[in-house]
Amino acid sequence: MTKITNTFEKLLTMTQEALLSKLPEYLSERSYSVIATDYYILGVSPSEDIQPCLVAHLDTINTHRGAGSYNYATKKWGTGRKATPKAEDLMISNKYITLSPEANPKLACLGADDRCGVKTILDVIEAGKRPHVLFTTDEEIGCVGSNRIITEDDLQALSDSSMLIQIDRGVHEGFWNEMVFYEYDENSIPEILTELEKYYTLAEGSYTDVAVLGPGYDKPIVNLSAAYENEHTRNEFINLEAYKKNTEGLLSFLTWLEGQDTANWKYTEKAPVWSYYGNTASTWEGSDYANYDDNTYREFVKEDLMCVYSGDTDEAMDIIENCKGFKSWLAVSNKSYMLYKEGTVLDSLKQLVTELGMEYKPA
């Protein structure tokens, strides 16, 4: 069996299925106890000390679609051939990794989201740290792996962990070191925020695995920069200098974490605030991606997004792919609500807010 090689070239050219097959052996050889399913791989730390759990997802947009395969008439992804990058598709310099201009036209993206997160976790392990580690599947289509964990499985290592740290943040607000807490109140345990701010810049975000797992396991969460930009597009690239700096920051934070009393650390949700932006609505004030999320859940996706994005089909598809998860977040919350029905977004949002017992406040 070919073993995992912890290089970007190797990780970017592997399928989700290949990683699911190879990673358990990698972890076992480093003294981890491993639980491997079709939905996730959990590596339980060999350390007897309380550990955080590092999280990354194994799929990329290439896992789910080839470039240009969304059918607006059926509102489904096409069944055309998908592609995974090969070594010759990559352009690697001392500073950046991106797709070559001659790369396979079937490729939808580089796949840095979230192979950068996978590599970061492997780098942390190679540096001698032994946190719990969780690799999930199909995050890009609604956090399938993490939803499975919440609804079907009970993972003791997550219950025993000090906090959940995902490495899956791109550049959304102009910084290569962004961190996002989602609906977790970052001020509830101020020492976490104070320490992380030494290495990362606070930003807003929409959704990823830890946004599902944190409330489910009552653990503090954060999603840290993975040093990629333009995810979900063929212009996606990795900033190697930022990657190195962010990994060093994570290692420093993990060292600090080892000396903390984390026994009483819990998940505390932010007070809900709903704002209205034209024809969209958001719980995440100030985030463009939040507005994109809600645009996605309009009844007539094609008309709305084509209007907003001036006929840029590729950008509209990228937004759809980026934002599928919000619907799943509602399901995880045991609410069967949608942000749209046959009427307008605003009407449905009013109903949602009312039924959740919150006050609707137009901005």
Regions from the PLM with identified roles:
Residues 48-130, 140-142:
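Active-site metal-coordination/substrate-binding segment of hydrolases
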Residues 2-53:
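A non-catalytic alpha/beta surface segment that caps or lines the substrate-entry region
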Residues 177-217, 363:
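An extended, acidic, His-containing surface patch that forms the Zn2+-binding/catalytic region
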Residues 230-295, 305, 351-359:
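His/Asp/Glu-rich mid-to-C-terminal helical/loop segments that flank catalytic regions of hydrolases
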Residues 201-246:
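Zn-dependent metallopeptidase/amidohydrolase metal-coordination segment
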Residues 104-187, 202:
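Acidic/histidine-rich catalytic neighborhood of metal-dependent amide-processing enzymes
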Residues 28-36, 197-202, 360-362:
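Short secondary-structure junctions
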Residues 289, 316-346, 350:
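Acidic, low-complexity, intrinsically disordered interaction modules
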